């Protein structure tokens, strides 16, 4: 990829990773519109690393408090709000790990296509609208509990289907379970840390074992661009979500799904 492609694709990944609009649906558009080739493993490493650094940096104080409370809970058996939240996030990560390891090849072979992405973009967009309109949530992320955490974790596992959107699926589930908009988003973003870390490790392992030549300039640029885009996106989303709700993202998803359908039948 040339520098322009790296910047555009890293921007797309960074901006869409934490919005409920599906990054995979957007990353398929350059190939459809411009005929760009697959981004390659180096790019995957870059954007996964950039997104991970962004969410860790943004929630650095919360994550540090959670980590200390979690280690204390193991040593002293004392549970606090932060330690409970840590355990719930660990629990919520398990379904995605199981599905990721057992169904990765099936998903990549049979589900990563325009038809699936267009369908899931529309269907899960409508579910997001329903969850946001029909429920009157008020819980915080510290009131999730292990049952709700597991349900949200299952939603995160379902988001391995391209076009679903990890943040979209988890926020939808959290809203249905009674969390406030901001709490649903915060829990979703905190959940992304172990998932993004695991993805970055696995893709890096694949890159090393593939023997591909690493373009360190493109790798560095991709990390920087995706980091800045993702960090900005997280900040603005949390700042505005309570006031504007999910409707703008639902409308956007429906329009994007329609565009992808148009490409299929063109």
Swiss-Prot record:
GO molecular function: undecaprenyl-diphosphatase activity
Gene Ontology biological-process entries: cell wall organization; peptidoglycan biosynthetic process; regulation of cell shape; response to antibiotic
InterPro entries: UppP
Annotated localization: Cell inner membrane
Catalysed reaction, written as an equation: di-trans,octa-cis-undecaprenyl diphosphate + H2O = di-trans,octa-cis-undecaprenyl phosphate + phosphate + H(+)
Keyword list, A-Z: Antibiotic resistance, Cell inner membrane, Cell membrane, Cell shape, Cell wall biogenesis/degradation, Hydrolase, Membrane, Peptidoglycan synthesis, Transmembrane, Transmembrane helix
Pfam families recorded: BacA (PF02673)
Membrane topology annotation: Multi-pass membrane protein
Function per UniProt: Catalyzes the dephosphorylation of undecaprenyl diphosphate (UPP). Confers resistance to bacitracin.
PANTHER family: UNDECAPRENYL-DIPHOSPHATASE
Family according to the record: Belongs to the UppP family.
Note: Bacitracin is thought to be involved in the inhibition of peptidoglycan synthesis by sequestering undecaprenyl diphosphate, thereby reducing the pool of lipid carrier available.
Protein name as it appears in the record: Undecaprenyl-diphosphatase
Organism: Shewanella sediminis (strain HAW-EB3)
């Amino acid at each position: 990829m040339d520098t322009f492609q790296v910047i555009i694709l890293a921007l797309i990944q960074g901006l869409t990773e934490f919005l409920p609009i599906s990054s995979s649906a957007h990353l398929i558009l350059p190939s459809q519109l411009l005929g760009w080739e697959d981004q390659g493993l180096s790019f995957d490493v870059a954007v996964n690393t950039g997104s991970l650094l962004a969410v860790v940096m943004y929630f650095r104080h919360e994550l540090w408090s959670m980590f200390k409370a979690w280690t204390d809970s193991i040593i002293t058996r004392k549970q606090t709000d932060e330690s409970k939240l840590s355990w719930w996030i660990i629990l919520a990560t398990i379904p995605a790990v199981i599905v990721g390891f057992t169904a990765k090849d099936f998903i990549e072979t049979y589900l990563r296509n325009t038809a699936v992405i267009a369908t899931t973009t529309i269907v899960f967009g409508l579910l997001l609208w329903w969850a946001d309109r029909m429920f009157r949530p008020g819980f915080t992320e510290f009131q999730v509990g292990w049952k709700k955490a597991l349900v949200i974790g299952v939603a995160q596992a379902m988001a391995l289907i391209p076009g679903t959107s990890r943040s979209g699926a988890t926020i939808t589930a959290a809203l249905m379970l009674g969390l406030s908009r901001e709490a649903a988003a915060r829990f979703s973003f905190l959940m992304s840390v172990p998932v993004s870390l695991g993805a970055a490790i696995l893709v890096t392992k694949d890159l090393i074992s593939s023997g591909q030549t690493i373009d360190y300039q493109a790798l560095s640029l991709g990390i920087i661009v995706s980091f800045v885009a993702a960090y900005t996106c997280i900040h603005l989303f949390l700042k505005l979500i309570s006031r504007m709700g999910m409707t703008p993202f639902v409308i956007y998803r429906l329009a994007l799904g329609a565009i992808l359908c148009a490409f299929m039948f063109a």
